[in-house]
C-alpha cells in the first residue's frame, strides 16, 4: 500500500514519522519503492543538496528496509512537462536524479529510471498532445471549476496509467522477484510508443476537487 505524501522530502518523510510507520508494518520480502527529488531542490543552505541530506536520508530508507528483510528500490523523479524550443524535455531536477543513480550503484539497489522513461514518453507524445496526460482542462470541465487548469507536474488518470506502465516495465527489466507475479499476457511497455488516448477508458468519480496539490 502507499504511504506517499505530496510535497514530501526524504528527510521530512522521516521526520514526520511516516518511514517509522511503514517499518512497523514491513515484513521480510516486502518492497519499498522510493521516488523523491521533485521538491528537494527547493532546500537551500548548509548540509542541503542532492549529495548531502538527500542522499543521507535515502541511505536511511535503504538500511532500515534491508534490516527488516525488505527490498528497497530507488525510482528517479518523473520529468516535468517542460519543453524547449526544439520539442525536447528540459531537465528541471538539477542533480537529484543523478545522485539517485549514483546511490543505487554504490549500494547495489535496483533503480527504475523514471526520469529517463518520462523524457522519452513526453517527447514521443509531443508538446501539445502531452497535455492530455496532465491536469490540463479548460474552465468548466468539472463542477465549480471556474478557471483553466494547467498543471505540468501532476497527471490525470491517462497519464498516471502510462507512468504505472513505466514502473511495471522497470520492475521487469530490473529482474525483481516480484516480476514473477506479472500477468502471463503482459507484453511489455515502450514509453516511446504510449497508448493511444482513445484506447483508455476511465469513469470519473462523482466527487471532485479542483485544488492543485502542493509541489511542482
Language-model features, listed with the residues they occupy:
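Structural motif
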Residues: 10-17
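Alpha-helical cap/lid subdomain in secreted, periplasmic
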Residues: 17-183, 205, 212-216
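A short, charged, Gly/Pro-tolerant segment at domain boundaries
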Residues: 184-202
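Short, small-residue-biased leader/transition segments that mark boundaries at the very start
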Residues: 1-9
Amino acid at each position: 500500500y502507499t504511504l506517499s505524501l505530496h510535497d514530501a522530502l526524504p528527510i521530512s518523510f522521516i521526520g514526520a514519522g511516516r518511514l517509522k510507520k511503514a517499518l512497523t508494518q514491513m515484513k521480510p520480502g516486502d518492497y519499498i519503492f522510493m521516488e523523491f527529488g521533485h521538491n528537494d531542490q527547493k532546500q537551500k543552505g548548509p548540509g542541503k543538496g542532492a549529495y548531502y541530506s538527500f542522499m543521507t536520508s535515502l541511505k536511511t530508507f535503504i538500511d532500515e528496509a534491508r534490516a527488516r528483510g525488505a527490498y528497497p528500490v530507488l525510482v528517479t523523479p518523473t520529468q516535468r512537462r517542460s519543453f524547449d524550443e526544439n520539442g525536447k524535455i528540459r531537465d528541471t531536477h538539477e542533480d537529484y536524479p543523478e545522485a539517485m543513480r549514483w546511490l543505487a550503484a554504490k549500494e547495489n539497489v535496483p533503480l527504475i529510471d523514471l526520469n529517463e522513461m518520462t523524457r522519452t514518453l513526453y517527447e514521443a507524445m509531443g508538446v501539445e498532445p502531452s497535455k492530455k496526460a496532465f491536469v490540463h482542462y479548460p474552465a468548466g470541465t468539472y463542477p465549480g471549476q471556474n478557471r483553466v487548469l494547467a498543471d505540468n507536474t501532476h497527471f490525470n488518470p491517462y497519464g498516471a496509467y502510462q507512468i504505472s506502465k513505466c514502473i511495471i516495465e522497470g520492475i521487469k527489466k530490473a529482474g525483481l522477484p516480484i516480476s514473477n507475479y506479472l500477468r502471463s499476457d503482459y507484453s511489455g511497455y515502450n514509453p516511446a510508443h504510449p497508448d493511444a488516448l482513445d484506447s483508455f477508458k476511465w469513469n470519473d468519480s462523482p466527487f471532485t476537487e479542483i485544488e492543485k496539490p502542493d509541489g511542482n
